[in-house]
Amino acid sequence: MSKLKVVQLLPELNIGGVERGTKDFSEALVQRGHQSIVISNGGLFEQEIINAGGIHLKLPIHKKNPFSLLQAKELVKVYKEYEPDIVHVRSRMPAWINYYAFKKLDKKPILVSTFHGLYSTPMYSKVMAKVDHTIAISKTVRDYIKNTYSVEDKNITIIPRGCDPLLFNKIKPDINWLNKWYEEFPQTKNKTILTLPTRISQWKGVDSFIDLIANINNDAFHALVVGPASKKKEKYLNDLQSKIKDKGLGSLITFTGSRNDISNIYKISDIVYNLSIKPEPFGRTTIEAIASGSKVMGWNHGGTKEILEELYPDGLVELNDIAQLKQQTLIISKENYAKPKENTFLSSKLIDSTIQLYQDLLKASL
């Protein structure tokens, strides 16, 4: 296998799935003997990329305004200096800057994009389809790309996201963690734990989750909403808490806020939910929960549907059908009820498939 020079472009390197994936992929490239160059405005993962042997070049390609396009000149300099084989764009603003940089290059690298979402502004997003090849993270995203941008099947490869079994596995939480958890959340002890891991947002299904708990209304169960609320969402969070109070559910639902021990929370959860009312492009929390040994449930659409169809069909429920969600929850939550199949969505598969795609595209270009 020939050695590659790969450039990845994204706005910043702070906390997020795309950012962490870029960092992990950079590390994997270096481990396999390739050269990895990441271009962004920097952030928390910047030093980790460098420590793992990658190169990070800081450019202000993160701001969504026309002046950012002036950074195309800087990208041209980088490409002429490093002569990459592959440029991989992971976000729209950097992709536009790259688009104008490529216009100034005589010898162009292979250009790949990953659609990490179902973008809501097609005119702004079309640059992600103006590439040699596109990666879709699910069939749902592939269909969106085909229908919105008229990209041919042969120019799209589905490479699902994956999780790292070192982080998400079935090793039981240690006693120290459990003691600290039950000290902080004594209301969860000896309960059937139902968990919704999500940031607080109107489309993420927290309302539906509260409705589910109201319908079950049994203190043998305790519900956790695990995730942050941004300042913009504080009013919505207050509305949710008022709804809980009005329904008399205060003792049955806990908002934990942002946590860095989500893998252990999955492990103590009897069921983990994805109830997003818009189709998820993939459904990362669903595979993380399955990998951690939890049962999972979700609405029958988007990337969540694709994962559950493969690994746990019993967890699928028709969109917004709270009665069915309750009925299936009561069945699945029983201790002896079957758990999902082994998780097949692994980060190692994502890495191997992406590198193989690069090699295939380079071979086809000769």
Language-model features and meaning:
Residues 7, 187-204, 210-213:
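Conserved donor-binding/catalytic core segment of Leloir-type glycosyltransferases
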